[in-house]
A protein has these predicted regions:
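Active-site residues of response regulator receiver
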Residues: 78, 108
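The feature encodes the CheY-like receiver
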Residues: 82, 100, 112
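Active-site beta3 strand of CheY-like receiver
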Residues: 70-76
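Non-catalytic signal-transmission and effector/linker regions of two-component phosphorelay proteins
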Residues: 1-29, 136-150
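Conserved acidic carboxylate
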Residues: 34
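Charged docking surfaces used in two-component/phosphorelay signaling
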Residues: 41-49
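Helix N-cap/capping motif at the beta->alpha junctions
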Residues: 56-65, 86
């Protein structure tokens, strides 16, 4: 009889993007959902410089797929986008078991109180109005929400 303990074998996956950011030392994953290419480029560059692993998509339909496949720690979500609005994306993510607990920051041009109330009712963690914040404010809110334990 062989008394050796078998060596555990790693679980193989065809999709490296499914690895969780909970791995020790791994950068936090941010899904940036923004249809404005210029603004998205600025945010993408700055967030990467801050040490985040960032994936950007330009519409709500792609955001839903990326939330499931990329498994972000936090989503920065525009509201007014082609195909599926940010409000609809938020609603779907909150009602999907795999994404229900995602941290979601709405970053939008919509400044009406009714829009903020709608985002709150749908479960947004934060609601930032583009004209009232600078990128350092957004990074501060991202860090805050990532530091919160569920």
């Amino acid at each position: 009889m062989d008394n050796e303990t078998p060596t555990p074998q790693p679980v193989l996956s065809n999709d490296n993007s499914s690895e969780t950011a909970a791995t020790a030392g791994a950068p936090k994953r941010i899904l940036l959902v923004e249809d404005d290419n210029e603004l998205a480029s600025v945010y993408l560059t700055r967030l990467q410089a801050e040490g985040f692993d960032v994936r950007r998509v330009a519409n709500g339909e792609d955001a839903l797929a990326a939330a499931l496949n990329y498994k972000p720690d936090l989503v920065v979500l525009d509201v007014m986008m082609p195909k599926v609005s940010g409000f609809d994306v938020l609603d779907i993510l909150r009602n999907t078991p795999e994404t229900a607990d995602l941290k979601i920051i709405m970053l939008t041009a919509l400044g009406q109180e009714s829009d903020k109330q709608r985002a709150d009712a749908l479960g947004a963690n934060d609601y930032l109005i583009k004209s009232q914040v600078v990128i350092t404010d957004v990074i501060e809110r991202i860090r805050y929400h990532l530091s919160q334990v569920d």
